[in-house]
Amino acid sequence: MTAFNSLFSLDKKRLKKLQRTLNTINSLKDQMATLSNEELQAKTTEFRKRLVNGETLDDICAEAFAVVREADKRVLGLFPYDVQVIGGLVLHQGNTAEMKTGEGKTLTATMPLYLNALEGKGAMLLTNNSYLAIRDAEEMGKVYRFLGLSVGVGVSDNEEEDRDAATKRAVYSSDIVYSTSSALGFDYLIDNLASSKSQKYMPKLHYAIVDEADAVLLDMAQTPLVISGSPRVQSNLYKIADELILSFEEQVDYYFDKEHQEVWIKNQGVREAERYFRIPHFYKQSNRELVRHLNLSLKAHKLFERGKDYVVDDGEIKLLDATNGRVLEGTKLQGGVHQAIEQKEHLNVTPESRAMASITYQNLFRMFTKLAGMTGTGKTAEKEFIEVYDMEVVRIPTNSPVRRIDYPDKIYTTLPEKIYATIEFVKQVHDTGQPILLVAGSVRMSELFSELLLLSGIPHSLLNAQSAVKEAQMIAEAGQKGAVTVATNMAGRGTDIKLGKGVSELGGLAVIGTERMKSQRMDLQLRGRSGRQGDIGFSQFFVSFEDDLMIESGPKWAQAYFRKNRDKVNPEKPKALGQRRFQKLFQQTQEASDGKGESARSQTIEFDSSVQLQREYVYRERNALINGESGHFSPRQIIDTVISSFIAYLDGEVEKEELIFEINRFIFDNMSYNLQGISKEMSLEEIKNYLFKIADEILREKHNLLGDSFGDFERTAALKAIDEAWIEEVDYLQQLRTVATARQTAQRNPVFEYHKEAYKSYNIMKKEIREQTFRNLLLSEVSFNENGDLQIYFI
């Protein structure tokens, strides 16, 4: 039995167990139907009482699902199918339900969300974009409110709206919250920058269902969510670095490996840089900023492609989501890469800002007590789901048989051949009136196909990053007779394509893929656009040896075949390669690409573990201070630790003749500007007591002035120190990762190098927090303004 078949054998066993619960739910159908609205609504109070009295969610699961099912029918006019109930049970168990496009994932989620919200700890559904979150909260929210639960929406249709803490607290205190993954991530980071209880709003992360789980939990897992703060000193090296890199010759001055997306300066390039800048030693410590900027410029030119990784819009670089081609509004690449791309495109170079806080989706979602996912394509990545999130992937049977035909790929030697063949095929299908969804792998390619269709006189809609606002509407209309829609991969996920009148008779929706994507899951998602709910349709992919997939992950023999045959073909007379070995080649290359993606995501987890441990430590200490609890940064403990450490330093490293100078310097830098005479004859114990006396006098004076506000002052002093040190640490760790990754070429383990340096930096950060808190407590000036508000001036 193959691994693929064994997965589905395992699914049968899982579904057999779920069938027993389904039978119980179905047996309650008539009973629920006889209840009045008031009696059905009263079930929510009953369930909550039963949970308080010791029953578990599993104990009330069948009855709760039956209640929601009946509520769905009364409120929405929709009664969940058996397969949707099974999907809901999978979600309640904290697993991923693989449900085909059009099978009703939105309705499926109502049952597990209601059940898990009954505990009063919150339940969330996280969608792919704000439009879907608002739409689903509005529609499904009617059911929850009917049953007495509150519903919050974590996003707004007004992108300019800046919600305050009170508004967000109201949202997150709701029984059920609809939001997006990115909104949740940024809210989490902002909440942990709060300096008082009144500014905090985020509850403990309890239960969440992630829509399009494979795209968010896997494909976007390496993308960090970053909150940027104060800018660095503006660099003038981007322009000069860009000028030099433009003069470099590939594989002579620098090495570029497209397959592994690696680029670095070779020895010849180093010599050119030394000659250009008139410096004797390129890698000397004093040249580190120059080296950094040259590497950034090299990355900007070779690793980031306009129309694929970003677009230029109104003089700004806007990043594209690799999974769907959408613009990532408000997102910038960190570490200077964004500025290097701006210089490459001859735009105004924006200030390079420091990262104040960051988190990856992986670490964000692993904080939930229970996590579930919905997707149309997750089965092939079940191993990774289990390893990273401890989530099984259960394939849910379709309510109606799938009637879509998936044709074998049409394979061509060159890109021009493939493009010509694709356009000719579109013409043939369009002549029949059958609607077409033509999917390109990048914004650049979608625009190219759009131009060629215009030249061919074929009217169509172009759906890519430039027109994301109309995305749902355009996708929804893509099934009308004669419609041709050109889209980027994954665009419109979450919106069904419904067939127009008479389209079934024409053969349903035709999905035409213009290249194999880097992951098999993406191709399956594209195919799944056609054939929803038993509709007829077909999918056909056109591929070539010049596609990104083959260039980046193809075997050497395939590259040799291309070089040998590329000049033998006529683009206007494309010839498809029919041999089985070529079909097998593209399948195996995609599997290799999937493996590389999984490996890269695994390395992200390894890298991010240091940041995660430090983040947890810092946030825990911040929350302890805000809540008035004692932590490692209790001001009283810090004074004792800092003074004791200084005395130990005097005892071990300072000569006797320098003793007075060191003590005075310590007092002046950390405690007071009023220096008093210190006798050379004082012992270290006497010096220690003397320093404690100074600290006690300063704090007593501030305590007398502040009275009941003294505790607020202590917390503020410590929080400010923590935040300053943590911002520096986050920024440093981001830079460190870039450096550590580069060390891989020097036969060093980049993860080991990173963790080693990160641990050193972590200890330095903790020491700096203690010392800065000490300074904040003693050197700060405090007073009350004319309104009676506490004012603190930190030196």
Swiss-Prot record:
| Disulfides per UniProt | none
The record ties this protein, via Gene3D superfamilies, to: Helical scaffold and wing domains of SecA (1.10.3060.10), P-loop containing nucleotide triphosphate hydrolases (3.40.50.300), SecA, preprotein cross-linking domain (3.90.1440.10)
Q: A Pfam family in this protein?
A: P-loop_SecA
The cross-references to SMART domains, in alphabetical order and at most eight, read: SecA_DEAD, SecA_PP_bind
Q: How does it sit in the membrane?
A: Peripheral membrane protein
Q: Which reaction does it catalyse?
A: ATP + H2O + cellular proteinSide 1 = ADP + phosphate + cellular proteinSide 2
Alphabetical keyword list: ATP-binding, Cell membrane, Cytoplasm, Membrane, Nucleotide-binding, Protein transport, Translocase, Translocation, Transport
Do you know which NCBIfam families this protein is assigned to?
Answer: PRK09200.1, secA2
> Which cellular component terms (GO) are annotated to the entry?
cell envelope Sec protein transport complex; cytosol; plasma membrane
Q: How does it assemble?
A: Monomer and homodimer. Part of the essential Sec protein translocation apparatus which comprises SecA, SecYEG and auxiliary proteins SecDF. Other proteins may also be involved.
Q: Which family is annotated?
A: Belongs to the SecA family.
Query: In which domain of life is the source organism classified?
Result: Bacteria
The entry's protein name is Protein translocase subunit SecA 2
Q: State the protein's purpose.
A: Part of the Sec protein translocase complex. Interacts with the SecYEG preprotein conducting channel. Has a central role in coupling the hydrolysis of ATP to the transfer of proteins into and across the cell membrane, serving as an ATP-driven molecular motor driving the stepwise translocation of polypeptide chains across the membrane.
Any GO BP annotation: intracellular protein transmembrane transport
- EC class (word): translocase
Q: Which GO molecular function annotations are given, in alphabetical order?
A: ATP binding; protein-exporting ATPase activity
EC numbers on record? 7.4.2.8
Annotated PROSITE patterns: SECA (PS01312), SECA_MOTOR_DEAD (PS51196)
Q: Decide whether keyword Protein transport is in the record.
A: yes
- Gene assigned in the entry: secA2
Q: Which residues bind ATP?
A: Q84, G102, E103, G104, K105, T106, D496
